[in-house]
Amino acid sequence: MLVSGSIAYDLIMKFEGVFKDALLKKNLANLNVSFTGLDKKMFYGGCGANICYNFSLFKGLGISSMLFGVAGKDFKEYGKKLSDDGVNVDLVGIDNDGFTASAYVLTDNRENQLTIFSPGAMGNINVEKKLTDKILKELDYAILSPDICERTVRLARKLKSAGVSWFFDPGQMTHAFKLEDLKYLTSNAFGLIANSYEIKLLCSKLKISENILRKKFNVMIETLGEGGLNVYKKSGVKTHIQSVKPLKIIDPTGCGDAFRGGFLAGLTKGLSIEQSCKIGALTATYKIEKPGTQNHKFTLAEFRGRYKKAFKENCSI
């Protein structure tokens, strides 16, 4: 499994209130607001790295992921941590003059989040040359999660040329893609994974309906947070997958990445899209019960037991 995406340090803070209470709808065009961030903590993060970490929780199944992206001169410790977790970091390019990207995340009392992302070294190196024909031939799937837009497009073209099926996961970069690039990405991806807002934004930029967007992919997965997710097949079949109730809610940061890691693990093991989505949903629940994006763990036996309790069926991995 090839995972393309950001590698970052996350600085997580809490806001004791609700964001909307500090905003005046009539004055949004002249926004000048300050929020107090409490309990600042730093964690390992980045969409690509988070997905790989969650995928690695299933390494006991004999599957592995390769992280594709760029980090800075401060990546050595982070890289060792990922390697120890079972993530292959050979395709990570290092900018020895820049720093690894950083995300500043503020969460309010209703789990709404504001994020400021500093790309750092992300756009400074071309790492596609690391992706050899030998590596491409060994891939089952790939996912293109949030990264520098130009690199996402270059990688998509390379994967298409090699015949590798890939998922488009634009996330917070949805707004940044050029129209012609969005048309290419949505016309050539095997599947799309996005939340409701990102799907609406895609439709707005492409000037098409959601129904037409769904028909572009073999599968489109619409994530709904605690509402679970919807799976749309090109055939028109829609399936709803419930979320798994957490024992406690500690930190929602990275839940989407956790879902993707679990989903891709299931898919790599040959499970159906629907079964893989259930694997992803439970992985996300484990994540929300811990602070940070790479601090949750489970054994396969624990996971299978909780899966059976949540979905009333045996886990197929």
Predicted feature residues:
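Conserved phosphate-binding/catalytic loop of the ribokinase/pfkB sugar-kinase fold
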Residues: 90-95, 103-146
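Gly/Ala-rich phosphate-binding loop of Rossmann-like dinucleotide-binding domains
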Residues: 56-60, 160, 268
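Conserved phosphate-binding/catalytic region of the ribokinase-like
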Residues: 1, 206-317
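Beta-strand->loop->alpha-helix junctions that form or flank phosphate-binding loops
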Residues: 68-73, 90-100, 218-224
